């Protein structure tokens, strides 16, 4: 079999469920890689003990032996972004200001991850309070890029991106207010998906003003894994969804606004706009209506608006 930590999340799921590899073997493989890389990369924080990790994996194996699977993530290790609550783990927001007592319950999307069988082994590092395009804080220090330790990991989901790009984890959750999933994913050659506002439920205290600036999303090394995790995170009662389409599989009638590079104001790497154009054509083929947009105000005004809203949301 291909080295366990090189498998995609969906490949791991298949291997675990057809019993070609055990949950304990999977956990041991990822723990070995974490023990080797994380002391330098510093992507994962508040890790539970190795003994506790292996005990969870052993229980997952026993459940499978009894014919019981919690879901497609059964036995797959994952860590939660340290802005969100995972029962029993401290939620520090990367700041010495916040208590390190274990959370009393999972946040809604974390409960979905756990409910699908994932084994939560710790947290992923963030800039303090999740504010910043690079990941470092006074509590845990600097997170390095998983592809090149001399480069920035990006932020604020930098710990998650590094854990995934370095194969310490197969996939991760994250959140994005203005690039916090997409930036670290771009910096590290993986896929980061910012879901539409409200598509994935968040704890009420995550957005007390109800501005909807932050969206939860998924990270992985390929689109298929991101899609699978996104589907799991969206699998909630309709009453909890703000997004009008939820996890619908078709795009007929959906309007998509496209700004492109805002008439040259936003520099793009070579090939990016052409790739986006191909994606727009695919979306149009699935029934979406593409509206080419222009900003009715200056880029400077847009930036000032963003800063004002972010400050208010804090």
Regions of interest found by a model, annotated:
Residues 30, 53, 75, 81, ...:
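Conserved hydrophobic/aromatic pocket- or pore-lining residues that grip, position, or stack substrates
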Residues 12-18, 98-102, 214-221:
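Short, well-ordered beta-strand elements within core beta-sheets of diverse protein domains
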Residues 72-109:
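Enzymes and membrane/adaptor proteins characterized by extended Gly/Ser/Thr/Asp/Glu-rich
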Residues 70-73, 114, 164, 250:
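Extracellular/periplasmic catalytic domains that process cell-envelope and extracellular macromolecules
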Residues 1-68, 232-314:
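Amidase signature
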Residues 44-45, 72-73, 77-79, 119, ...:
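Short, conserved beta-strand segments within well-ordered enzyme catalytic domains
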Residues 105-230:
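Short glycine/serine-rich loop segments
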